[in-house]
Regions:
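Compact, glycine-rich, soluble single-domain proteins
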Residues: 9-51, 61-92, 96-97, 102
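Short, low-complexity, polybasic intrinsically disordered segments
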Residues: 74-77, 117-130
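A short, glycine/Asx- and small/polar-enriched loop/turn
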Residues: 52, 114-119
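Beta-rich nucleic-acid/ligand-interaction surfaces
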Residues: 108-113
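Flexible glycine-/small-residue-rich
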Residues: 14, 58-59, 114-116, 124-126
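Residue-level signal for inorganic ion chemistry
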Residues: 26, 57, 120
Length: 130
């Protein structure tokens, strides 16, 4: 099935900084982002347009900071309990938009196989306006 591989990262201060409206806006973007080809091959179709799904795999390592050191620091990542709550909310809201979501197991070591059409990588961040 075609879809998005979504790697949500959970910041330790996300609840304090990120409103429900911002989170909903980002997830609407995930569902509505037109990055799948239309009949002419132009990026013009979204997950909702194609009936695609999302694979949501929690990725605290995206907060790994290796500046000036040989081992990354993960102090900006949410602690496990908060991270799990944020991840579950992320999945629930995305499903509320009508997207089928497959999930990984939170805090588990997983082997994930995917075929990437692209290369296309898009960053959506509630901290930055692009």
């Amino acid at each position: 099935m075609r879809g998005h591989d979504v790697l949500p990262r959970q910041h330790r201060a996300l609840y304090a900084r990120c409103s429900v409206q911002v989170t909903a806006h980002l997830l609407a973007r995930v569902a509505q982002l037109r990055i799948f080809g239309d009949d002419a091959g132009k990026m013009n179709r979204s997950l909702l347009d194609t009936g695609g799904a999302a694979l949501a795999i929690s990725q605290f390592t995206l907060y790994g900071d290796a500046r000036g050191q040989r081992r990354p620091s993960f102090v900006q990542a949410a602690p496990p309990e908060l991270g799990k709550n944020l991840y579950e909310e992320f999945v629930r809201v995305l499903e509320d938009f009508g997207v089928t979501v497959a999930t990984g197991v939170f805090q588990a070591h997983m082997s994930v196989d995917l075929t990437n059409e692209g290369p296309v990588t898009i960053l959506l961040d509630s901290e930055n306006t692009f």
